[in-house]
From Swiss-Prot:
SUPFAM superfamilies: MurCD N-terminal domain, MurD-like peptide ligases, catalytic domain, MurD-like peptide ligases, peptide-binding domain
Chain residues that bind ATP: G115, S116, N117, G118, K119, S120, T121
Protein name: UDP-N-acetylmuramoylalanine--D-glutamate ligase
Pathway membership, UniProt: Cell wall biogenesis; peptidoglycan biosynthesis
Name of the gene: murD
């Protein structure tokens, strides 16, 4: 921040959680700033007034003159860089995001996690591992607390989840270690193609000292770097120096090379995709120098996150799992591939919603292999049905109540009812949390 001239304002774009965090940060440090939001009446106006009642505010548009005169433009992740008013000043004024500012100000090492799926789980798990080792850790980013709110002198380690939107405006994160857990089609309503999404995700590695890479997902791997160390993780047998899975007579083990670390049956989070998440977390913890045994104990105790392959109930021999956070095809693929092999019966899958321009056909093989019945909801239900229903019974439901009741009717003891929509929720629900909460409500009412 010392590089900024105090006689020129920062232009903060967006009055959501990130913009309000930026406003609070600048106010506490005595910097002048203005705020703009393309919405006429953004919900954050009252909170901004409480933070700083004197700040200039423009709503309903971006003010071109104020943008051109700004020292920097701090852009919220919900506003695309392609906005015409931002393109008009690109090259004249530095455009960055809160993560870029955070990376300049953080005085402790950063572990950065991104990917299409699993990033909140891994971020939270690494945070729990650090706490188990007695480290003063700050955890946040895309999953909760904005990164600027994490900054504190006493913090010894930052563990942050980052979205592709946040990374678009991050020039050089400089993380101690970073990972792209996996990559599958998502946000195609924002990106021109999969390559643009891929390149945004790979920005997490800029200036990174150790890259934690998924050996099983070529899309999640950057070009090999001479500057960064590399640690690999895989669901296959690991090579020396890699994290992976050993299939032994007594079951599957998480392993580091030939060293067995933890039997997967001791983990409380379900599914093979969570084996991969656990391995990535262990690799990141290793990069931060955390002691292994407290990390393994934290892994044993970790129960997972709400709305992410969350166990809800067992009813009449049928397990009900809430994976409402699965808002893209890759997340639902991971849930099916992870839960299918450990389910004695079939899976009754509730899916659908707003597809965000995704191609649903990559989900078809997993549906064919593991799903006995499809219950389809939401505005892109017809597209899902067309892409997935070949050879599988497909039924439509107008509400979550109807979907849960249909799923209960079509399931038998040993089956698993899985809400894993592969879509956004806003056509029928307030958000994915509301969708998951309604699922749990109607399951418990059965």
């Amino acid at each position: 921040m010392s590089i900024l001239a105090r006689d020129r304002n920062i232009a903060v774009i967006g009055l959501g959680k990130t913009g309000l965090s930026c406003a609070d940060y600048l106010t506490r440090r005595g910097y002048g700033f203005c705020v703009m939001d393309t919405r006429e009446n953004p919900s954050g106006l009252a909170e901004l007034n409480a933070i700083n009642p004197d700040v200039p505010v423009v709503t309903g548009k971006l003010d071109q003159d104020m943008l051109a005169r700004a020292a920097e433009i701090w852009l919220s992740p919900g506003v695309p860089l392609s906005h015409p008013d931002l393109q008009a000043v690109k090259g004249q004024v530095k455009i960055c995001g809160d993560v870029d500012v955070f990376s300049r100000e953080a005085n402790a090492p950063i572990l950065a996690i991104t990917g299409s799926n699993g990033k909140s789980t891994v971020t939270t798990l690494v945070g729990e591992m650090a706490k188990a080792c007695g480290v003063n850790v700050a955890v946040g980013g895309n999953l909760g607390t904005p990164v600027l709110d994490l900054l504190a002198d006493e913090v010894e380690l930052y563990v942050v989840e980052l979205s592709s939107f946040q990374l678009e405006t991050t020039d050089r994160l400089g993380a101690l270690a970073a990972t792209v857990l996996n990559l599958s089609e998502d946000h195609m309503d924002r990106y021109a193609d999969m390559m643009a999404y891929h390149l945004a995700k790979l920005r997490v590695f800029y200036g990174c000292r150790r890259q934690v890479l998924n050996r099983d997902d070529a899309l999640a791997q950057p070009p090999l770097s001479r500057e960064a160390e590399i640690t690999w993780f895989t669901l296959k047998t690991p090579e020396p120096g890699q994290y992976g899975v050993l299939e032994e007579k007594d079951g599957a083990w998480l392993a580091y090379g030939a060293e067995k670390l933890l039997p997967v049956e001791q983990m409380r989070i379900r599914g093979k995709h969570n084996w991969s998440n656990a391995l990535a977390a262990l690799a990141l913890a290793d990069a931060a120098g955390l002691e292994r045994e407290p990390c393994l104990q934290a892994l044993r105790e970790f129960t997972g996150l709400t709305h992410r392959c969350e166990w809800v109930a067992d009813k009449d021999g049928v397990a009900y799992i809430n994976d409402s956070k699965a808002t893209n095809v890759g997340a639902t693929q991971a849930a099916l591939a992870g839960l299918g092999p450990v389910t004695s019966g079939g899976i009754v899958l509730i899916c659908g919603g707003q597809g965000k321009g995704q191609d649903f056909t990559p989900l078809a093989p997993a549906v064919k292999e593991w799903v006995s019945t499809l219950i389809i909801i939401g505005e892109d239900g017809p597209k899902l049905k067309e892409a997935l229903a070949g050879g599988v019974m497909a039924l439509s439901a107008e509400t979550m109540e109807e979907a849960v009741k249909l799923a209960a009717e079509k399931s038998s003891p040993g089956d698993l009812v899985l809400l894993s929509p592969a879509c956004a929720s806003f056509d029928m629900f307030k958000n994915y949390e509301d969708r998951g909460d309604q699922f749990k409500q109607w399951v418990r009412a059965l």
